[in-house]
Amino acid sequence: MKKLILTAAVALFAFTANAQDGAATGSFAKSDLFVSGTLGFSSTSQGDAKTSGFEFSPSVGYFLTDNIALEFGLGFGSDKAVNDDKTTTVGVDLGARYFFTPASQFSFTVGAGFEYQTATTSFDAGGDDLKVNAFGFAVSPGVNYFVSDAFALRASIGALSYTSTKQDVSGADASNSFGLNLDLTDINFGLTYKF
């Protein structure tokens, strides 16, 4: 079912892009500056265990060439469990995104970037907070679609990633992971404004 929804969404994007070829639409070019952001909410429940989450990730980007944009972003997140344990995440990332058809209203993209995050969990039962630091690299495919001359919708789906995670305590060992995820469990939507 998820694959059917994804296929329908991609087909709708492609159809809309072709249907509006004659209309005035936005596009990207060398030296363009833009701001972008994603906003996410989540809620998971399994029996009595419930978790809710919120994430906000603003970024700023600049086109170095007609096809390549450099992006710098921040990330803020918060997850809360039913027992009132709370995890707060703060991160920064730096990356580049390649636009296959930047002068068009619709473009497939592929992005790659580095990210550093710090997550702090405070426990409702008391005790010391748990702090975890993570560094990672990811490559992800996506799409960009201009809905006006300045505003564009963007989406990225999944990632090929490497992450190294380590608790912020003396003597802790790092945990390294490598993954490939190209399904709807890792999809991000955002809005872009081009100056």
Feature-to-residue mapping (PLM):
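Outer-membrane beta-barrel biogenesis signature
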Residues: L4-A11, F15-S36, Y98-T101
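Short glycine/proline- and aromatic-enriched beta-strand/turn motifs that initiate or cap beta-hairpins
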Residues: Q20-D66, L70-G73, D186-F195
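Predominantly the C-terminal beta-signal and adjacent terminal strand-loop region
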Residues: A23-A24, S78-V82, G142, V147-F195
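Residues that define the transmembrane beta-barrel architecture of outer-membrane proteins
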Residues: S31-L33, K50-F56, K86-V92, F106, ...
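Residues on the lipid-exposed face of transmembrane beta-strands in outer-membrane beta-barrel proteins
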Residues: G37-F41, P58-Y62, L74-F76, V92-Y98, ...
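Outer-membrane beta-barrel translocator domains and adjoining extracellular loop/strand segments
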Residues: S45-F54, K80-V90, A119-N133, T165-S175
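Mid-chain, structured segments of secreted extracytoplasmic proteins
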Residues: D66, E71-P102
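Repeated loop/turn-to-beta-strand initiation elements of outer-membrane beta-barrel proteins
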Residues: N67-L70, S104-F106, Y145, A150-L153
